[in-house]
From Swiss-Prot:
Disulfide bonds: none annotated. This is Na(+)/H(+) antiporter NhaA 1/4. It comes from Streptomyces coelicolor (strain ATCC BAA-471 / A3(2) / M145). Na(+)/H(+) antiporter that extrudes sodium in exchange for external protons. It catalyses: Na(+)(in) + 2 H(+)(out) = Na(+)(out) + 2 H(+)(in). The gene is nhaA1. Pfam families: Na_H_antiport_1. It is found in: Cell membrane. The keyword S-adenosyl-L-methionine does not apply. The chain crosses the membrane at residues 16-36, 55-75, 95-115, 125-145, 156-176, 178-198, 215-235, 275-295, 299-319, 340-360, 371-391. GO terms for biological process: regulation of pH.
């Protein structure tokens, strides 16, 4: 096997991709707080792109809205496969991560507001900061520490974090964004409808188009247009990635040997793991702590910490357990409630959506600095605690697998 093939194969491993993501985040944090921080800010704020299309964006924005959309496409695509062929095909199992996501959105916001009332209402506008889960970082931590965890737990996390993030983005778009371009939003919806029809349509016309035009030439430009329209409408452009992933066809047709869904994942996963996610982490995780002198005494610091570290755990676990007891929904037999507790702690990782929400809601630079510092501290704490819990559960599942293997050979 050639060196490029070995690298590509390695990048299809979640553990390798997760390690690259975490490593890039550490480099960004050190760089942003080093004597060379000015070079980091200069790189992150450098703008490029076609101004005529209103896409003359900073490197940071291209990474957060553009490259991250590729990762969200892969997540949506993987969820589509699970909905059609796998774990989420059973509504009783799909209901639990969705209930966890709804609890993981609502409870952190309520906890934030409760702490805000206790501090006299200061920084109440930041209630949306703890609502979202940093899915890229959460999946990375799970991949690195949970190599022996059951596969359904990863599906649970993907479903939870995707619904969580999309719910948070939509809530913030309605509550905190006044400049939504509904024309661009409508055109994006039309583009998504065309994308879905070309993927899943069964008529002669669409079959002829798919036969005559190479898939990459048909869908890549269309996806770029949909992404640009979603970006122009003022809603987080990564939503376009998730929706297009969910619209992918998961069954081959005609002479196809593999479905478009599996073919797209085969091509894009190494790019996402090796380029998109590390660059996103490098451009997004560099939170400067300069000027955070009042960090410890700031109300928003404790509000964010409480929302992410307490609200997420209570919301995710509190959304899952009652649902399983009061309805026909149930966990996969391979999972235990200790696994879900680890995922609930992992949900306290912010970053992906929390940082943009902090920028939208902060009323001063001091508030923004404190909010970013709190997101960083909460995310690091959640990642370390989840690593301990899930690492222990991974060893537990490894022992169970060994015992089962020994029993099978005797």
């Amino acid at each position: 096997m050639s060196a490029p093939s070995r690298i590509t194969a390695a990048l299809r491993s979640d553990a390798v991709g997760g390690s690259l993501l975490i490593g890039a985040a550490v480099i960004a944090l050190i760089w942003a707080n080093s004597p060379l921080s000015h070079s980091y800010e200069a790189l992150r704020s450098f703008t490029f792109g076609p101004s005529a299309l209103h896409l003359n964006l900073s490197v940071e924005t291209w990474a957060a809205d553009g490259l991250l959309a590729v990762f969200f496409f892969i997540v949506g695509n993987e969820l589509k496969q699970e909905l059609v062929h796998g774990e989420l095909r059973d509504p009783r199992r799909a209901a639990l991560p969705i209930a966890a996501a709804l609890g993981g959105v609502a409870v952190p916001a309520l906890v934030f507001l409760a702490f805000t009332l206790g501090s006299g209402g200061e920084a109440a506008g930041g209630w949306g900061i703890p609502m979202a889960t940093g899915i890229a970082f959460a999946v990375a931590v799970l991949a690195v520490v949970g190599r022996h965890l059951p596969t359904p737990l990863r599906t649970f996390l993907l479903t939870l974090a995707t619904v969580d993030d999309m719910s948070a983005v939509l809530v913030i778009a309605v509550a905190c964004t006044s400049g939504i371009n509904f024309t661009a939003l409508a055109l994006a919806a039309v583009g998504l409808a065309v994308f879905g029809y070309l993927q899943n349509g069964s008529g002669r016309a669409v079959a002829r188009v798919r036969a005559m035009v190479p898939a990459w030439l048909l869908f890549v430009p269309l996806a770029a247009v949909v992404w640009a329209l979603m970006h122009a409408c003022g809603v987080h452009a990564t939503i376009a990635g998730v929706v297009m992933g969910l619209l992918m066809r998961t069954r081959p047709q005609g002479a196809e040997r593999v479905s478009p869904s599996h073919r797209a994942e085969e091509v894009l996963r190494p790019f996402s793991a090796g380029i998109a996610l590390p660059l996103f982490a490098l451009m997004s995780a560099g939170v400067s702590l300069a000027g955070a002198g009042g960090f410890v005494t700031s109300a928003i610091t404790w509000n964010v910490l409480a929302g992410l570290l307490v609200g997420k755990v209570v919301g995710i676990f509190g959304g899952t357990w009652p649902t399983s007891r009061l309805t026909s929904a149930h966990l996969n037999p391979l999972l235990g409630w200790a696994d879900i507790a680890g995922i609930a702690v992992l949900g306290g990782i912010g970053f992906t959506v929390s940082l943009p929400i902090a920028e939208l809601s902060s009323t001063s630079q001091a508030h923004l600095t404190d909010a970013k510092g709190a997101i960083l501290l909460a995310s690091t704490t959640a990642a370390l605690l989840a690593a301990l819990l899930l690492g222990r559960r991974s060893r537990h599942h490894q022992r169970l697998a060994r015992q089962a293997a020994q029993q099978a050979t005797t």
